[in-house]
Amino acid sequence: VKLEFFAQRLLRFGLVLILFWIGAMKFTAHEAEAIKPLVETSPFLSWLYRIFDLRTVSNIFGVTEITAGMMIALHPVLPRLAVLGSTVAVLTFLTTLSFLISLPGWEPKLGGFPALSGTGGFLIKDFVLLGTALWTLGESWAAMNIKSSPADARPHQKLFANRR
């Protein structure tokens, strides 16, 4: 049980750290250029470049990722906000995983699928991040909806049960 408790905290911290770090990188010219081919070929996002310039699109993603990370980090005190942040993270990772289809993530020199290209290798990890975001969503949803007495709650939920 202690290992599970530690692992859950590590998953949440890791997700928050990644969202903060990758979000902060979106404010650099290098990252704005790096995501351009992904966004340009996406059926869900390509329209953004018709409205905004390269850096603005990247900055929008950065603000979104950092905000989601902050909301997820607030789970112990504001689980309702963590639900929203986790939902944004789930949508973010579903979108980035769609890049595997819209920008082929397979290496043609190695025969294509299942040989991952550099971009494909970078994106495939988002399956784990998606799973983590879904887990944080479920945990925050459960914490938000505690209707039973604090005695029935998990130890970390008891701590914050009277603050809601």
Q: What are these model-predicted stretches?
A:
Residues 1-164:
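Membrane-interface extramembranous regions
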